[in-house]
Amino acid sequence: MTLSTFLPRPTVLTATALSAALAVGLSAPVTSTASERMRIQAAVPSGSLAFEILEEFGDRVGAATDGRIDVQVLSAGAIVSSDQILDAVDVGQIEAGFAWPQFWSGHHPATALFSNTPVWPASGLDQLTHFSWYYEGGGKELYDELMQEVIGKSVVSFPVTASGWQPLGWTNTVIENFEDFAELRYRTPPGLIGEIFDEAGVSTVFLGPEELVPAAERGVVDMAGWINPVEDYAMGFQDVFDYYYLSSVHQFVDVGEIVVNSVFYDNLSAGDQAIIETTAQSVLLESYVRDIHRNSQMLTKFQEEYGVTVMTTPGDINLRLLEAGQQRLADRSAEDEFFARVVKAQRDYAGSADAWWGEVLGIYGTLRAPD
């Protein structure tokens, strides 16, 4: 027995066999490496914290999917105006968009209840209780019903930003009481929050984010509320106004969301859908903790570098807003059954959570660490 016994014999390919092999190879299916483009048009400018969060969302989705989903984040007004984002996503003009559910109030007033819960004492929900209700207390199911069945939009929604309570806003006028405030032309958010200011007797103007600073420079508005110090800085309010009024009760919850076209989303694999969902949840938490950290720093920057005077909102303004908030919730609930369902669901959940979380908030509200 020789060594050749254990060695494989060389294979000789004839021209015919080689041609056949090539034909089989050329006809075999080729695995595509093309990625799915996912454009997210935001309702905020580049440079804002929300835009930063969206870019991180895109980077993580791209990395986790090995490039199968190519997320491209576009700033406010890049393709459509901010108030048209939902409609553009619905019809597939863009794959996704970012704004706050209150921006969809033209379709149904209840959208604001999932984004900018009005006047904390009226609903009983602060930011964390709102998320507890949304994820654990049936809030998400109500929102899906609202968007997909009541409004009839072909979208899937993912909360991605949270910034908690919002200041009253910016002005060049010292405000000592509600009467002073009522004399100003005040830019409000759209939807329910704007209605509350109207109910209170404030002269309101709604402007999209693209219009805010130019309108202030032209004197179209005397005072403007946006989001918080970090986001307001990105808008440039510190270059237009001298006074920044904090401590308002009109809005204690702020949730920004990505809405994704349902056809686009349904065509993704279950694994890639899970990546989008879990990535949204991860940046949602980061946005909240980053928001607290940076807003504290930004207030100092406003005062030391820009000469902004940080003011406390007069108490009678907050009392008037509380009364107006209660009234608008009652009026809207009487007008619309779905709106009433959401308000009841939120209040019921807030009541059930109060034995635990309300006690904690009460302690925080009455005690401070010694200097």
Which residues fall in each region the model found?
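Bacterial N-terminal signal peptides
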Residues: 14-27
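Hinge/lid segment of periplasmic solute-binding proteins
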Residues: 138-152
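Signal peptide processing junction and immediate N-terminal pro/mature segment
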Residues: 26-34
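N-terminal secretory signal peptides that target proteins for export/translocation
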Residues: 1-9
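Intrinsically disordered, low-complexity segments enriched in proline/serine/threonine
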Residues: 10-12, 31, 47
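N-terminal secretory/targeting leader peptides
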Residues: 33-130, 150-371
